[in-house]
A protein has these predicted regions:
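A cross-kingdom marker of C-terminal helix-rich interaction/assembly modules
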Residues: 1-79, 84-85, 99, 105-246
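Internal, conserved structured core segments that host functional sites
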Residues: 85-86, 93
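Extracellular-facing segments of soluble proteins and assemblies that are Gly/Ser/Thr-biased and enriched
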Residues: 91-102
Length: 246
């Protein structure tokens, strides 16, 4: 079997050579695009891995499809579209992870009852924090609790951007970042920074959802997986959290 990083490189080449993508844009922003693809790649890896795929049922398909559509919109020059799809993916994933946590809890205690979820992200956040408190150690998994809160912060920012007025939807030229501010009220660096942060928070919720399985993983395998998307320090920190080590 090929090393995971080799598979990633192969799949990334396929990704940036999809039909109708903007080649000049990809060439000048390849490192940023690679970060985007890296995060989606490891989400897909965990989704299909024998040890962790039980956390991803058919209802997760919507979240993953939205992530793929958002990344394709990015490569084809649809700035606002890519952020709108990313926000939809974030919203779908937020509810999905909470519903999975609830399902796992009910497997241990079928008598548990939970408040219904609605479309309001802020209300879901309150229920999220309340529901996991009895089962998730807020010291060991403090980063999980922080990610739940950060997701709401970035969701609000995305909402403000995708609902802002614009006369350029979508911008289809390879130079579209020259007009990015008018389209999204973000400059190029801010755009990618926000995109990466939202993707990171989507991943983190899924990562901590899988904590019971990941605790049993070989640290070397987990390191090589996370290293595709994160730096060495961040990778080691995430491993220590699920392993329960300081």
């Amino acid at each position: 079997m090929k090393p995971l990083n080799d598979i990633f490189q192969f799949e990334f080449e396929k990704f940036i050579n999809l039909k109708d993508v903007k080649k000049e844009f990809i060439s000048s922003n390849q490192s940023e695009i690679k970060k985007v693809f890296g995060c989606i790649f490891i989400i897909n890896f965990f989704k299909n891995r024998v040890e962790t795929k039980r956390y991803y049922n058919s209802e997760f398909n919507m979240t993953f499809s939205l992530l793929l559509e958002s990344s394709y919109a990015l490569l084809s020059g649809q700035c606002r579209g890519s952020l709108l799809l990313l926000r939809s993916a974030q919203e779908a994933n937020y509810k999905y992870v909470l519903e999975c946590e609830r399902r796992i809890m009910k497997e241990h205690d079928p008598t548990l009852a939970f408040e219904a979820l609605d479309y309001r992200f802020g209300e879901t956040q309150k229920k999220f924090l309340k529901d996991i408190k009895p089962i998730v150690n807020n010291i060991q998994f403090n980063e999980y609790y922080k990610s739940i809160e950060r997701n709401l912060t970035y969701y609000k920012k995305l909402s403000g951007i995708v609902h802002s007025g614009s006369a350029n939807i979508p911008i289809m030229s390879v130079e579209y970042f020259s007009n990015l501010y008018q389209d999204t009220i973000l400059n190029k660096d801010e755009f990618f920074d926000l995109y990466h942060k939202v993707l990171n928070e989507i991943f983190l919720l899924n990562y901590f959802l899988m904590r019971e399985s990941l605790e049993k993983w070989d640290s070397y395998v987990l390191y090589n997986t996370l290293r595709i998307s994160f730096g060495d320090k961040r990778t080691n920190t995430l491993i220590k959290i699920v392993k329960g080590t300081k």
